[in-house]
C-alpha cells in the first residue's frame, strides 16, 4: 500500500515509533473509534507494517452503547474501513469489537473514567488472547496539551505534569504505545484528506459537561486567541521536558521504596510504618504518586493537597482513607497497607 503523502509527518512518526518497539512480530492491537485520529493511525500502520516484522494488525473497536444507533453506525463504519484496508495492503488486518453495558458505565461519579477503564481492561484481555505484545492508541499532541492543562488545574505533581507517556506498560509483557503523540490533529486531518479517507465525528466531543471537552472547546481557544497562539505546542513541549526530569524522581522513588516496602500480600502493598517517620513529607508524597502509577491505580483524581495530607498523616496509628478507584490506605500497628478494598 503506497499512500499519496509519503513524506507526511504522520507516516514518519509511525515508522520511527515502530522501529523503536521491541517484540512486535506477534502482532499489534490498535484502538480505533472511527474518529480522525484513530483512523489516521490505523491507515498509517497498515502502510508501514511489513509481514516479516509484524504478522498482523488487530483493530479493536469499543462500542460504548451510549448513543444507541450512532454507536452501532460507528462500529459498522470501522468494520467497512478495515475491509477496505485489508484489500489494499499485504498486512493481515483483523477486526475485534466489544459492546459495553451503558448502565455499568454510569455507576459512580465519572462516566469518562469508567469508560476508559473498561476500554483498557478489554485491550489487556485482547492482548493476552491474541498474544500481542503491543497496544497502540491514537493520542496526539493536542491530547497532550489538554492533559497537561487539565492536570495543572487539578494541582498535579511533577509526574502528572509529564502528561501522556509515549510508551508505558499496560500489563506484564504488554506495552501501551502512542505513535502519534508528537503529531497534531491538523497534520492527521491533512494526511487523511490527501489519501481521500473519511472518518466519523463523535457529537459527544462537543459536550462541555466533560472537563477535557471544556478545556479543548473553551479554555484552550481562549489562551490561544488572547495570550499565546502556540499554547498547544508549548504545553506539549513542557510535558516532554518534565518527562525527562520525572525519570530522576522515579529513581528517587525506587530508592525510597526499597526502604519502605515489605513483602506484599496478594494485591495489597505493605509499608513499614516505623520507617515512614524517617522521610520528609515531600519524599513520601513523591513515593506515593510513583507507587500509584506503578500499580496502575487511579492517580489523576487525587489533588496535590490530598497527596500532601496523606503523606503527613499516613504514619499515624489508625489512619485510614478511601480514594478514587476503590483504593484504601490503612495504618496498623507496624504496617501501612495500600490496595483495592
Where do the model's predicted regions map?
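Core alpha/beta nucleotide-donor-binding catalytic domains of modification enzymes
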Residues: 1-217
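Short, surface-exposed loop/turn segments at secondary-structure junctions
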Residues: 202-206, 229-232, 301
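AMP-forming adenylation/ATP pyrophosphatase catalytic core
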Residues: 2-37, 53-54, 58, 62, ...
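Internal, active-site/partner-interface "lid" segment
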Residues: 205-212, 233-243
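Single-residue recognition of alpha-helix capping/boundary positions
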Residues: 187, 231, 303-306
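Inter-helical turn/loop segments and adjacent helix faces that build the functional surface
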Residues: 222-234
Amino acid at each position: 500500500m503506497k499512500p499519496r503523502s509519503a513524506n507526511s509527518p504522520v507516516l514518519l512518526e509511525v515508522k520511527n515509533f515502530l522501529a523503536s518497539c521491541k517484540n512486535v512480530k506477534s502482532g499489534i492491537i490498535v484502538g480505533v473509534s472511527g474518529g480522525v485520529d484513530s483512523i489516521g493511525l490505523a491507515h498509517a500502520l497498515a502502510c508501514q507494517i511489513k509481514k516479516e516484522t509484524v504478522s498482523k494488525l488487530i483493530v479493536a473497536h469499543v462500542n460504548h452503547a451510549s448513543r444507541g444507533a450512532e454507536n452501532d453506525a460507528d462500529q459498522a463504519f470501522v468494520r467497512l474501513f478495515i475491509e477496505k484496508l485489508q484489500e489494499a495492503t499485504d498486512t493481515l488486518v483483523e477486526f475485534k469489537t466489544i459492546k459495553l453495558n451503558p448502565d455499568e458505565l454510569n455507576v459512580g461519579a465519572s462516566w469518562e473514567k469508567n469508560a476508559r477503564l473498561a476500554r483498557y481492561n478489554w485491550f489487556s484481555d485482547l492482548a493476552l488472547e491474541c498474544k500481542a505484545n503491543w497496544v497502540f492508541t491514537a493520542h496526539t499532541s493536542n491530547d497532550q496539551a489538554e492533559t497537561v492543562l487539565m492536570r495543572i488545574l487539578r494541582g498535579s505533581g511533577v509526574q502528572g505534569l509529564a502528561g501522556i507517556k509515549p510508551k508505558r506498560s499496560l500489563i506484564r509483557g504488554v506495552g501501551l504505545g502512542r505513535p502519534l503523540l508528537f503529531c497534531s490533529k491538523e497534520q492527521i486531518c491533512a494526511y487523511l484528506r490527501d489519501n481521500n479517507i473519511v472518518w466519523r465525528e463523535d457529537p459527544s466531543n462537543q459536550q462541555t459537561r466533560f472537563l477535557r471537552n471544556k478545556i479543548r472547546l473553551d479554555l484552550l481557544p481562549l489562551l490561544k486567541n488572547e495570550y499565546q497562539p502556540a499554547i498547544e505546542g508549548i504545553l506539549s513541549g513542557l510535558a516532554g521536558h518534565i518527562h525527562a526530569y520525572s525519570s530522576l524522581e522515579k529513581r528517587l522513588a525506587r530508592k525510597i521504596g526499597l526502604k519502605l516496602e515489605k513483602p506484599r500480600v496478594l494485591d495489597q502493598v505493605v509499608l513499614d510504618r516505623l520507617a515512614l517517620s524517617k522521610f520528609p513529607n515531600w519524599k513520601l508524597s513523591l513515593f506515593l504518586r510513583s507507587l500509584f502509577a506503578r500499580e496502575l491505580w487511579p492517580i489523576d483524581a487525587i489533588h496535590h493537597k490530598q497527596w500532601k495530607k496523606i503523606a503527613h498523616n499516613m504514619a499515624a496509628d489508625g489512619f485510614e482513607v478511601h480514594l478514587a478507584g476503590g483504593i484504601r490506605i490503612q495504618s496498623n500497628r507496624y504496617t501501612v497497607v495500600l490496595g483495592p478494598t
